[in-house]
Amino acid sequence: MLPYPQIDPVAVALGPLKIHWYGLMYLIGIGGAWLLASRRLNRFDPTWSREKLSDLVFWLSMGVIVGGRLGYVLFYDLHAYLANPTLIFEVWKGGMSFHGGFIGVMLAALWFGKRNNKSFFELMDFVAPLVPIGLGAGRIGNFINAELWGKATDVPWAMVFPPFSDPAQLPRHPSQLYQFALEGVALFVILWLYSRKPRPTMAVSGMFALFYGIFRFIVEFVRVPDAQLGYIAFGWLTMGQLLCVPMIVGGLFLIWLAYNRKPTAKPAV
């Protein structure tokens, strides 16, 4: 069994002002995505300035934050937030939904593309290889918060999470780290390498949806579902898995469509 490295969720406290690691992970993810996007900016559109790229990253980040929070409220704990709506704004305590953030990003990309003469999939193919940076950083934030841990297990790398998070004090799968490895590291490597060569429009977006859906679906088998939801069907299906099914199907369809129509191949950057 490995010791859980207890880290204060508050990174910096300046009087009443508290800066949480969870929030810093979002900033790290957004900043890292911007840096890598700037490296591929000329391949995407030589006429774009760094300022326009910053605008894109800003609006997509707003889509992640607003969509992620509202997605968690709607998909995972609507009753509690209806009972106390002020809880919606306590984002430093966790409670973000990837699938909600994904919807938020798509809506932001649609809006930004129309204002800047870019198609939806041009933008999505550009940003898809950058998303795993934010996903990986977010999972580290979950780990520091000691939330979203896995089922009890006797594997050698099991961890006992703090009593405030897990009163049962059982050795558990560190599922946040599994998700960091798959959704952060593995997904980044797959998409970054795949997008280095010219790909048909929609192909990189399809690869993102497919592999994220697969990785998340797998990890959900060892992750404890949200207590207020539990398993929603068959005694094993979680909300996360249910939301991944359309991503997997949609990803396969986009890849098939990308390679079975006749667009001009562009660098998917």
Curated annotation (Swiss-Prot):
MF (Gene Ontology): phosphatidylglycerol-prolipoprotein diacylglyceryl transferase activity
Positions contributing to a 1,2-diacyl-sn-glycero-3-phospho-(1'-sn-glycerol) binding: R139
One annotated Gene Ontology cellular component of this protein: plasma membrane
GO annotation terms (biological process): lipoprotein biosynthetic process
One Pfam family recorded for the sequence: LGT
E.C. number(s) listed in UniProt: 2.5.1.145
Membrane topology of the entry: Multi-pass membrane protein
Membrane-spanning parts: 17-37, 56-76, 92-112, 120-140, 174-194, 202-222, 237-257
Record keywords: Cell inner membrane, Cell membrane, Membrane, Transferase, Transmembrane, Transmembrane helix
Pathway the protein acts in: Protein modification; lipoprotein biosynthesis (diacylglyceryl transfer)
Transmembrane in keyword set: yes
Primary localisation category: membrane
Subcellular location: Cell inner membrane
Protein function: Catalyzes the transfer of the diacylglyceryl group from phosphatidylglycerol to the sulfhydryl group of the N-terminal cysteine of a prolipoprotein, the first step in the formation of mature lipoproteins.
Protein family (similarity comment): Belongs to the Lgt family.
Name this polypeptide is given: Phosphatidylglycerol--prolipoprotein diacylglyceryl transferase
Organism from which the protein derives: Pseudomonas putida (strain W619)
